[in-house]
Amino acid sequence: TDNPISGFWTAGRGYIAGDWVNWGGGGWNLLGNPFTSAMNADQFITENALDFDPYYQALYVYDGKNGYYRYVASIIPGYNDPGIVQGGTFGSRIQAGQGFMVMANNNGVTFNFNSSMQVHNTALPLLKSAATEDPWPGLKLNVKWGEKENMTTIVFNDDMKNSLDPGYDVGLLSTGPDVEIYTAIADKDESVNLTRQALPIAGVDTVKIPVGVDCYAGAEVTFSAL
């Protein structure tokens, strides 16, 4: 097929990733919440973890008002604020009828939906435990050009690695904005731009994190850290 985004539904509310012309893996596929209720995005990701490209183990929701994608990925304590500037998270609930993009690991994988993912009262918080987890140390690196802003997140935890941590390191789905900032995997040369990167605390004073900025030639940008 010459359709860059294609696929079909299967019995049992599954979705098989279709072909992407000249793409090595399953490519980007457009899915949506098939339920008449909200859907628990975290549970959907957990159930289908092996079907995602490991650099993009997330759901990407397009923010039409601002013209960029927000992501839903593994929750990191202290960094799940859906109200932050471009490059931020979307939260953990996908409302009925809401579409989202996924990067399939290869052609033919199946993304499964089941009724246990349904959430009927979105006003209630998702309670994972009785205690509140301590926020991970880290920063939100912001770049600004004129009135345009973009952000990338870097966090630290002893369970993370300098290499890829699927679901915690989140690839960037870019819309080509006026200004954009991202990082790359710290321990090797990678071509995947990340909107969020998780690293170990040990050795944090010596690790070098590649940071990239896309903007108009000659533009003057301002950096800040939150």
For the regions a language model picked out, list residue spans one by one:
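Compositionally biased Ser/Thr/Gly- and acidic/asparagine-rich
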Residues: 2-226
